[in-house]
């Protein structure tokens, strides 16, 4: 008999400690730009032209999504683990941004800045960010994109990492890295007199769970003060033939505030159930003739299906909303199979009566002929060889299962010796991962 046996070696929901919750991205709406006050003075016979930004104001980035249901998603990093978040009807994967509207003063205007010298000097304006250390406390942790994670003092179970984006005129937004734990230089603005440039800012952030919740809770919308942007003073003396001095100064500040959506903390881990009949799956392969390999390098021998049920509302539903995990699987080959995440040949057993010169290949129902690549039996996210089952659970139509059908092929494999007749038997384990 020709058989391929697959085993469910691991069946565990994944739990880690820290999770990335959501992204917030700012768009300019109901926004204004700070404008400078012009003064013309003298120091003795020397003329001094000064542009001063006055007053402190606040830029508020408010999430347009009223609430987020947040739950764990494993990652190989045990401290900073990203998670999926689910709105009412669609997934919000951690690489997507949740839109916000930005109101208040959102930047600086350099319209009206002029000089009487020839040539005019270029302004070199350092722009710094000052962390609100009364609200945020720097940690040694970094987000997946290497941004510092700050603990929110009022809610120590939560952390936030963020970036400020800068937009000059009609140019695209340039996101500025935050690699420092305290105050840091954002960038140095290079502005020419007379170019009427407006500099506006955006904010994007990620929230991180720093402590595993012991129960389901919710956190109301927060107005989270991140810190303040401040333009550093710049000046140049006795410029050009006219010997005029120029000054630019900011005697106020631009406070940055993040208004989060309502956050639901989900204590239970999402999971699915593997039907007992799938825990050990013998796959009987059809017999093939040795001569068939004279014209074929691989021949279909049989098929099998993997299916898990995710309909348990205890784990996968909250406040009437389904919180389905993404169901992934890794196959690990036995009998000396190379499990490095790139190999797609499953070694067959050797010995008396066993065929030689042949291996097996398991092909996916992906529509493009993908083959299973064998990896270690780990449920960790991004495990080598891990892939997402073709059909995922969905609230639509009442089908809360994940499944895929696989086909098994004989493959002529010269690395296994000359092709001889005999039995073909192999085994592989599969590890389900609920992410």
UniProtKB/Swiss-Prot annotation:
Highest rank taxon of the organism: Bacteria
Pfam families: Fimbrial
First and last residue of the signal peptide: 1-31
Segments forming a coiled coil: none
GO annotation, biological process: cell adhesion involved in single-species biofilm formation
Subcellular location: Fimbrium
Gene3D superfamilies with a match to the protein in the record: Fimbrial-type adhesion domain
SUPFAM superfamilies: Bacterial adhesins (SSF49401)
Cellular compartments per GO CC: pilus
Record's keyword annotation contains Signal: yes
InterPro entries: Adhesion_dom_fimbrial, Adhesion_dom_fimbrial_sf, Adhesion_dom_sf, Bact_Fimbrial_Adh_Pro
Keywords: Fimbrium, Signal
Record's keyword annotation contains Signal: yes
Function: May be a minor structural protein required for pilus biogenesis. May be the adhesive component in the pili.
PANTHER family: FIMBRIAL SUBUNIT ELFA, FIMBRIAL SUBUNIT ELFA-RELATED
Family statement: Belongs to the fimbrial protein family.
Name of the protein this chain belongs to: Minor fimbrial subunit HifE
Organism field: Haemophilus influenzae
């Amino acid at each position: 008999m020709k058989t391929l046996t697959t085993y469910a070696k691991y069946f565990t929901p994944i739990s880690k400690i820290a999770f990335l919750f959501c992204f917030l991205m700012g768009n300019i709406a109901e926004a204004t730009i700070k404008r400078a006050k012009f003064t013309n003075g003298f120091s003795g016979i020397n003329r001094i032209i000064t542009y001063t930004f006055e007053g402190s104001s606040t830029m508020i980035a408010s999430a347009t999504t009223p609430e987020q249901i947040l739950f764990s998603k494993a990652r190989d990093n045990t401290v900073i683990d990203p998670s999926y978040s689910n709105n009412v009807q669609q997934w919000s994967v951690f690489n997507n941004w949740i839109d916000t509207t930005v109101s208040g003063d959102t930047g600086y205007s350099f319209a009206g800045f002029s000089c009487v010298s020839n040539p005019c000097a270029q302004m070199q304006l350092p722009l710094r960010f000052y962390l609100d250390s009364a609200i945020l406390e720097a940690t040694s942790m970094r987000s997946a994109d290497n941004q510092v994670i700050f603990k929110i003092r009022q809610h120590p179970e939560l952390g936030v990492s963020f970036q400020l984006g800068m937009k000059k005129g009609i140019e695209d937004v340039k996101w500025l890295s935050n690699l420092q734990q305290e105050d840091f230089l954002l960038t140095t603005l290079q502005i020419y007199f007379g170019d009427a440039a407006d500099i506006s800012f955006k904010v994007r952030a990620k929230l991180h769970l720093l402590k595993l919740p012991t129960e389901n809770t919710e956190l109301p919308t927060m107005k989270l003060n991140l810190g303040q942007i401040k333009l550093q003073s710049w000046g140049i003396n006795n410029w050009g033939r006219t010997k005029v001095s120029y000054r630019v100064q900011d005697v106020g500040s631009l406070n940055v505030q993040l208004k989060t959506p309502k956050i639901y903390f989900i204590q239970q881990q999402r999971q699915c159930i593997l039907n007992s009949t799938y825990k050990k799956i013998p796959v009987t392969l059809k017999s093939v003739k040795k001569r068939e390999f004279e014209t074929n390098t691989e021949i279909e021998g049989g098929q099998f299906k993997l299916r898990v049920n995710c309909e348990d509302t205890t784990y996968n539903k909250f406040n009437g909303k389904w919180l389905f995990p993404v169901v992934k699987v890794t196959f690990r080959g036995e009998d000396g199979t190379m499990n490095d995440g790139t190999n797609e040949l499953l070694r067959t057993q050797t010995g008396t009566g066993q065929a030689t010169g042949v291996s097996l290949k398991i092909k996916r129902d992906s529509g493009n002929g993908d083959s299973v690549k064998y990896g270690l039996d780990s449920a960790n996210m991004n495990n080598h060889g891990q892939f997402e089952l073709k059909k995922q659970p969905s609230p639509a139509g009442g089908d809360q299962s994940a499944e895929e059908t696989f086909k098994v092929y004989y493959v002529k494999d010269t690395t296994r010796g000359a092709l001889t007749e005999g039995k073909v038997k192999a085994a592989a384990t599969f590890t389900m991962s609920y992410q």
